[in-house]
Structures are given as C-alpha cells and as structure tokens.
C-alpha cells in the first residue's frame, strides 16, 4: 500500500524550493490554506489541481518538471547530515514469509522519478510519487499540509521484472 514519505507545511516546502509567487498561491488553494476561488468547487475547503485553469495547471507541471531532481531527492533522501544513503522496505503479508529489500537511495530515486502530470482525481504525480493535500485529521488545520506518498511495494515488482 501507499506510505507517506514526506509531509510539511507549504511554507516549509517554499523555503526548500522557492516557489514563484503565482505557484505558491495555486498550492495554497490546493492545500486549503486559502478557500476556493471558484464557484461550486468539488470540496468547499480546497481546490483540486483539475479545477485550476489550463495556464495554472501548466505552471504547476512546469515547475515540478524543472525541479524534479531536487524535489525527489529532498522527499526520498533528505538533506544534510541525516540524508539517507539506503532505502529499506519490509513486506509482511499474512501467512507468508517476511520479505525485505535494501537498496541504494540513488536507485530508489531513479525508480520513483518520471513523468509529471495531473491525475484525474486532481493531485500531482511526479513519476511514481503522488503529491496531495494531507486531508483527514477531523477538521484540524494540519489537514492542510502537503504530503508526498509512494507505494514502496513497487520496488519488489521491479526486482521480479528483472529476474
């Protein structure tokens, strides 16, 4: 299943990636930091990327294409003295042997990187990474955080394909 690999407030991502002001505003509507600017949004708390104009959608896509290497590295590896060099996945399925794999982080970064697109559900895909509003949290403000998710089990299918 899917696992959250990074979750922060938009202002913290802005400190890392320096969003252009127009993009920052789009992402504020996306996370719900700002109330929707359109009539009859799918969700009264926020806007989905599919609800923005084509030009606004292109701004989002172009920024994440241009900065994909930096963004994926920050999300999966991190920065500074605690940056990860390895990626461990443990798979426990009922009534089956435990499986695990340990991969160099750069292989994992390459595996999860790829085409940047807006999904039909209004989130962003950066390769195999999903960017979405955190949501949940019973209406608490922390639902407005931005999160990135992956399915770590996909690394097991990559090994099977090569064998």
PLM segments and residue spans:
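Short, positively charged
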Residues: 2-163
């Amino acid at each position: 299943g899917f696992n959250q690999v990074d979750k922060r407030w938009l202002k913290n991502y802005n400190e890392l990636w320096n969003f252009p002001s127009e993009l920052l505003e789009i992402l504020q509507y996306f996370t719900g930091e700002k109330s929707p600017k359109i009539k009859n949004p799918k969700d009264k708390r926020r806007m989905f990327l599919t609800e923005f104009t084509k030009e606004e959608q292109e701004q989002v896509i172009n920024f994440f294409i241009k900065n994909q290497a930096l963004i994926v590295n920050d999300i999966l590896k991190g920065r500074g003295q605690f940056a990860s060099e390895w990626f461990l996945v443990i798979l426990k399925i009922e009534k089956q042997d435990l499986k695990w794999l340990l991969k160099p982080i750069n292989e994992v970064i390459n595996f999860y990187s790829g085409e940047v697109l807006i999904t039909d559900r209004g989130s962003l895909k950066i390769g195999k990474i999903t960017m979405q509003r955190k949501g949940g949290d019973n209406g608490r403000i922390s639902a407005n955080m931005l999160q990135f998710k992956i399915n770590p089990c996909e690394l097991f299918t990559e090994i099977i394909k090569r064998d």
